[in-house]
């Protein structure tokens, strides 16, 4: 399904929070939406491997990487794992790498920067916790919608008219 965050903001202006504009698209899917699972990890993506091994149907992994752009948290291997397990997307308050490969995956990926340096994978961090960045507080279970214009968050799923297949929401 295609999402138009501008339309959703117009329709649901009282129900959504808008994340400050700092993210860029890196995945093959330019719009995506779903229920989030939060994770906080700094320059260590070991926990992300564990989380992305789970069934991701209808879900988005929201990663608070502390805004670090010194080392990439998301790489092509993690993106492939996410696709294999049906994840809708990944939003990372941090960096990604291997961007040409990331663009080939049918997966929404938004991050604040790209850098070739990878990070460690020791598994430090925590999941299903409250995280805050971009002027918004995120909880596991919230709903996130993203496109090239931006990212919005809602406590409840937004009702989308999917009667017309070609309609962009």
UniProtKB/Swiss-Prot annotation:
Subcellular locations according to the entry? Cytoplasm
Fetch the Gene3D superfamilies from UniProt.
Answer: Ribonuclease E inhibitor RraA/RraA-like
Q: Keyword annotations for this protein? A: Cytoplasm
The protein's matches in Pfam families, at most eight in alphabetical order, are given as:
RraA-like (PF03737)
Query: What GO terms in the biological process aspect are recorded for it?
Result: negative regulation of RNA catabolic process
Lineage, top-rank taxon, reads Bacteria
For this UniProt entry, what is the primary localization, expressed as one broad class?
cytoplasm
CDD domains associated with the record? RraA_family
Q: Which GO terms describe its molecular function?
A: endoribonuclease inhibitor activity; enzyme binding
Report one GO cellular component. Answer: cytosol
Indicate the quaternary assembly: Homotrimer. Binds to both RNA-binding sites in the C-terminal region of Rne and to RhlB.
Q: Which PANTHER family match?
A: 4-HYDROXY-4-METHYL-2-OXOGLUTARATE ALDOLASE 3-RELATED, REGULATOR OF RIBONUCLEASE ACTIVITY A
The entry sums up its family as follows: Belongs to the RraA family.
Role noted for this protein? Globally modulates RNA abundance by binding to RNase E (Rne) and regulating its endonucleolytic activity. Can modulate Rne action in a substrate-dependent manner by altering the composition of the degradosome. Modulates RNA-binding and helicase activities of the degradosome.
Q: What is this protein called?
A: Regulator of ribonuclease activity A
Source organism per UniProt: Photorhabdus laumondii subsp. laumondii (strain DSM 15139 / CIP 105565 / TT01)
Instruction: Write the lineage as a comma-separated list.
Output: Bacteria, Pseudomonadati, Pseudomonadota, Gammaproteobacteria, Enterobacterales
């Amino acid at each position: 399904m295609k999402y138009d965050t501008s339309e959703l903001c117009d329709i649901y202006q009282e129900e959504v929070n808008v994340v400050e504009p700092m993210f860029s698209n890196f995945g093959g899917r330019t719009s995506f939406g779903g229920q989030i699972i939060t994770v906080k990890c700094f320059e260590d993506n070991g926990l992300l491997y564990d989380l992305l091994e789970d069934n991701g149907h209808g879900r988005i992994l929201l990663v608070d990487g502390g805004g670090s752009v010194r080392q990439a948290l998301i790489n092509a291997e993690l993106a492939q794992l996410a696709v294999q397990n049906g994840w809708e997307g990944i939003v990372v308050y941090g960096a990604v790498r291997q961007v040409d490969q990331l663009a080939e995956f049918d997966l929404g990926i938004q991050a604040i920067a790209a850098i070739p340096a990878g990070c460690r994978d020791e598994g430090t961090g925590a999941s299903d916790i409250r995280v805050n960045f971009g002027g918004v507080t995120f909880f596991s279970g919230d709903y996130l919608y993203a496109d090239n214009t931006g990212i919005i968050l809602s406590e409840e799923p937004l009702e989308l008219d999917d009667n017309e297949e070609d309609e962009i929401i």
